[in-house]
Amino acid sequence: MIVDSSALLAIILNEEDEPTLASAMVDADILRMSAANWVETAIVVDSYRDPAVKVRFDDLADVLRLRIEAVTVEDAFRSRAAHNDYGRGHHRARLNFGDCFAYALAKRFREPLLFKGNDFSQTDIEPALKD
């Protein structure tokens, strides 16, 4: 399963849907995240002044054995295509920069994507959580 920044942040920040997202991650055989999404998540986490948030991020990545996948040239092209098809200003899904890399990784590995919100549900990506 591919993990988007939104899902990981919801767990780290103890948001309302944390139990559902955490359960999906624990039940997955393998968890992957694009290096671009990992950095995106780290930037958000590091903006919090609470050191416990940073510790939760680092610990969670270790406990879940989250695989940080390098961005390939193919991912770069897929991310651009995702932006052209589903990005802000192009489509109601309004995928942002990070979303496009999560999309590309899900396509590369042909794995469902765990995310929070409704942006990806308006694309052709397979969601990890079904409605």
Predicted feature locations:
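Active-site neighborhoods of divalent-metal-dependent phosphate/nucleic-acid chemistry enzymes
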Residues: 67-112
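A general structural signal for well-ordered alpha-helical segments in protein cores
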Residues: 18, 38, 54, 76-80
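Helix-loop "lid/cap" segments that line or gate small-molecule binding pockets
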Residues: 44-47, 65
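Acidic, PIN/NYN-like endoribonuclease modules and their adjacent C-terminal/linker elements
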Residues: 103-131
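Glycine/charged-rich beta-loop-alpha catalytic/anionic-binding loops adjacent to active sites
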Residues: 22-23, 59-62, 83-89
